[in-house]
Amino acid sequence: MKEKLKSFRELGVICVLIALIILLTLARPVFISPTNFINVVRQTVQIGIMAVGMTFLIISGEMDLSVGSIFGTTGMLAATLYKGNVNPTLAFLIAILAGCAIGLLNGVLVTKTKIPAFIATLGTMKIFRSVAYAISGGQSISVFPESVTNSWVFKMGGSLGPIPIQIFIMAVIFIVAGIVLAKTEAGYNMYATGGNPKAANLVGINTDRVKILGFIISGAVSALAAMISIAYLGSVPTTAGEGREMDVIAAVILGGASLSGGRGTMLGTFIGAMIISVVKNGMVLLSVPVFWQDGFIGVVLILAVLLDTFMHRKDSRG
């Protein structure tokens, strides 16, 4: 029954995406042009990759509000190292490890001090946003040495034919994460931890370790998204990652994951991320003022949470 319900939710999200594409195509035929649609998928990359980590977390019953700040901090760190002509591969690895370290800090704060994830990661969101500003001196960082721009790290911002390489990277990450979630013990443990933590502990699952792993993955993929952004843009603005956490959480919840834990899929998250990108791109094409765009995403997020709450109550009664 649960498998049928999960498939029904995924099918519903896919139908929403298809309906949006049809409506926007009717309103602005340019929306479905190959160039624009590839751009929509490319715009999904950063949100999508970060949402992979958030999916693991939300399934295990937690969330991370600091992902945008991790994106900004690791991006500024990598850009500073690039600017200093540090070996690009080493700079890349340092940034990814920094993301893992921040994720580890979040995980320890939540599991060992029992501070609610919302409060703990809200605190680290503010802390590491300040760190990002401190690293950059409040200035955007750009114009990197040729040894950096010619390296494989910056190739991530290029294209393979008409398709941006970052889209292939996102696809690989989603496929691997989907397999881990659906076919491995680690994935089972995350579902068990979020679905019924007491029962999970009774059968020998270390729920604290599962949650810490989720936070580490979230930090790592947020840092990776920042590296891809640098490679594509060739710069890091001072506002890098600001507000990104809301888009990421919205994508996961739209994709059918439950804020109460124990439910969600990578396919659903990908479709949710696509919906966010389609809506944002469509609003630009329809000349909707920028200040309404985030407001609309907020409304969509509230509706998704209300639907999740309704479905959770229905499941409990059933």
Whereabouts are the PLM-identified features?
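Helix-loop-helix "hairpin" substructures at the membrane interface of multi-pass membrane proteins
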Residues: 87-95, 101-106, 110, 159-236
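Loop-to-transmembrane alpha-helix initiation sites
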Residues: 10, 42-43, 88, 117, ...
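Single transmembrane alpha-helix segments in multi-pass membrane proteins
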Residues: 22-84, 109-114, 256-266, 299
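Inter-helical junctions in multi-pass inner-membrane proteins, predominant
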Residues: 29-39, 133-135, 180-187, 214-250, ...
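Cytosolic-side transmembrane-helix boundaries in multi-pass membrane proteins
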Residues: 1-20, 175, 195, 202-209, ...
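Transmembrane alpha-helical segments in multi-pass inner-membrane proteins
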Residues: 222, 233-298
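Transmembrane helix-bundle core of multi-pass membrane transporters
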Residues: 117-184, 210-213, 233-241, 316-318
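Short loop segments and helix-boundary regions at transmembrane helix junctions
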Residues: 2-5, 63, 101-142, 180-185, ...
